[in-house]
Every structure is written in structure tokens, then in C-alpha cells.
Amino acid sequence: MNFFNIEKTSESKARAGVLSTDHGTIQTPIFMPVGTVASVKTVHQREIKDDIKAQIILGNTYHLYLRPGMEVMQEAGGLHKFMNWDLPILTDSGGFQVFSLSGSRKMSEEGVKFKSHIDGSYHLFTPEKSMEIQRQIGADIFMAFDECVAYPSDYNQVKLSMEMTHRWLKRCIDWNAENPELYGHKQRFFPIVQGSTYSDLRKISAEVISEAGAEGNAIGGLSVGEPEEELYRITDEVTDILPKDKPRYLMGVGTPWNILESIGLGIDMMDCVMPTRNARNAMLFTWQGVMNMKNEKWKKDFSPLDEFGTSFVDHEYSKAYVRHLFVSKEYLAKQIASIHNLAFYLDLVKVAREHILAGDFYQWKDSVVPVLRQRL
């Protein structure tokens, strides 16, 4: 059984495919909800699977390492059993989170020494340590340990960082070759293209990552503050180089329109905290545009939350009621909004896939993106 099969390519770069893991198949393009600490914020696993219809979720290596810790994780039998989730999981390497701790970490060729945000204790993440933790977590897809630089960054700084990421990749690959899976299911390894917004560095990195021969490849270091045009330009350049027969994962992206544009550039997998984070701040994404549920205009609007929505919350609750919950600072507001946004994101990529299969993806995308961006 191949890990990745392409069902159809479009007239340009968009494609529909299937990822096959030991915990189930994933239809691509796919959006992956983020479950940082073994939970998607405010949402039950049953809702993620049955109502939101997620096919794969993310876990975070840095956060899970610190709490609950790997002793608990291994005694539970891995993350799937710990959180009672029987579908695929992807874990990041912890690199992005560690490098975000700019005031409390020290980097060397060996790895990164950092201070826990929980109790102030010091820890060392090396490529080998990141791989070991991700073995203990047991995700179906796990990522190489990389350095993600801030935007903007000096060219020479980005070049040195990228070269370090490439050296660390070799150490990740060597460790994986010597240390088999722990829980009886296959784990697939993805290295990460870096290089910020410098085209020549991205080209070098994409070629190095392609030559690694991994089962999938990721593009990191984007959606970190660069203009949308740069996000699309770099994504386009990198997908021109990455192997066409391997899945491509664009990390940390993004808005609904970012997602559709990225699919059009040949991306198969995406994740982002935006649907849940924005939901907790009363921002809902819909097929008609973006809604701020605290706005006065919804105060007496008793129509369904979203008549085109796919989740139960869209039809059981009115706009007026959800606005009332937000204004009243009720926890239920965040839960309803999170379920809605995640269900919308999953519906978005599902419909995008249907249009790729139908052969009219680009015409459809160009017509729907301006609508998605408008404020209601």
C-alpha cells in the first residue's frame, strides 16, 4: 500500500489524493485541526470526528514533552490511546515553539537549550531528542527538527539557519534508522524546507529536502508575518521543486483564502490555530464572508448561525443567541464558534477537492475567494 496516491491533478498544480496510514486514510487536500496539548481547544474528540469530520489532527511535541511528559505518554501507550483518538495524528518537532522562546533559549550545533514556560526548568532539545519524543508520542506523521527564523531576518542569518536545519536533518534520519517504532504502527517522517523569503535559499533547501527521500515533505517558516504575496510566491517556487509523488505540507497556514490559494499552488496538507483562536475571539468564517459575533447587527437576528454550515451548531443556534453568549462572556460561545469554524474549514477543503476532481478548481477558487474575504 502506497503512503500517498494522487487521484487527479488539475490543469495546473492543484491535486486530489489519498494518504494511507495505519490509523486510517486521509483525503487530500486536507486541513488539520491543531490539538496542541492533546486537545483541540474547547472541542470534544467525538465532535472533532463526527461533526467537524476531521480526518487527522496535530499534537505539539514541545508542549506534550513538558506536560504530561513522556513517562505518562509511554505508560498510556502513546498519544492515540492517551487522548482516545483512533484516527491519524501528526506531530511537529517542537522547533517552532522552542525558537519562539527567544528570551530564554540558547542555540548551538548540538541543539537548543530552553527554559520551560511552565516551571522555569531547563531542557535541551537536539534532533535526536525530538525524534525520541516523537517516537514516544507515536504520531502517524512526524517532523524533522528544524530552526524557524523570524520574519524579516538578515540573509546571512537565514542562510546559516537553513544550513543548520540541513545538518540536523541528517541526524534525525540517522536516529530514525536506528530506532524503530514503539507501538506497532508505521510512522512517516517529513523533513522541512526553510529559507525565509529568499528564493535562492528556498531553492537550495527544497533540493536538499527532496534528496532526503522522505515519504512526505513540509514547507516551514512561512505565515510568520510576511505579506500574502510572499507566502504565495515562495510556496509556488518550492512546490515546483519538491517531488510530485510525495505529499506537501504547508505549515501554519492560514485563512480560508490562504488555504485555497495554497491548494492551487500544489499543497496537500495545512494546519493552523486560526479557526479556533479566532473563534474564541468571536470571529466566524463562512461561505458568505467573515462575521464578528459581537457586532450589534446580530442582536436581533434570529436566523440560524450559518444556513450553509455543516455542523449542528449552525442550525441549532441563532446569530442573536451566539452574540448574547459572547457579550455575556459565556464559555459556550467559544465552543459553538470553534465547532463552527473547524467544520467550515473541513468543508472548505472538501469542496475544493470536489472541484479539483470536477476539473474546474481554478475558476471556482477565483470566484469564491473575494466572497470569503468580505466582512459581514
Show the residue positions of the predicted features.
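Glycine-rich phosphate/ribose-binding loops and adjacent secondary-structure elements
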Residues: W175, N179, R188-L305
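Flexible, glycine/charged-enriched surface loops at secondary-structure junctions
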Residues: E178-H185, A358-Q363
